Amino acid sequence: MSIAVIYGSTRINGNTEQLTEHVIKGLEVEKIFLRDFLIQPIDDRRHTEGGFTDVDDDYSELVERMMKHDTFIFATPLYWYSMSGTMKNFIDRWSHTMRDEKFPDFKKQLGTKKAYVVAVGGDNPYLKGLPLIQQ
């Protein structure tokens, strides 16, 4: 089993990172800290004639690294009943990747992966994390 841990927190050694370290203790993983990369927000052009245009950032490199693994652990703080903005930007860009010739069968390949979520919240995290998990 090959595991990629995708960290969505901007805080170095914050609560999300500390809890995730307990979860992955003893496992061999590749750690991907989204905060260390430039990920532009999606410019949604799914329904335009020209479609998506190339974006000059680090996103494609991150997708390539992630897709080498068969299991993903998404680690994120809970902000306003959802994932961090950093994580959201990364996942939103998947819409672009599903139409990118550099990543043929991206959606199909995602369907073969296992995914887990480590979500860290302050007050009432079970209630506030529910919308994230139900998405």
Put a short name on every predicted segment.
Residues 1-104:
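N-terminal beta1-alpha1-beta2 submodule of the flavodoxin-like/Rossmannoid cofactor-binding fold
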Residues 103-135:
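Short, glycine-/small-residue-rich phosphate/pyrophosphate-handling segment
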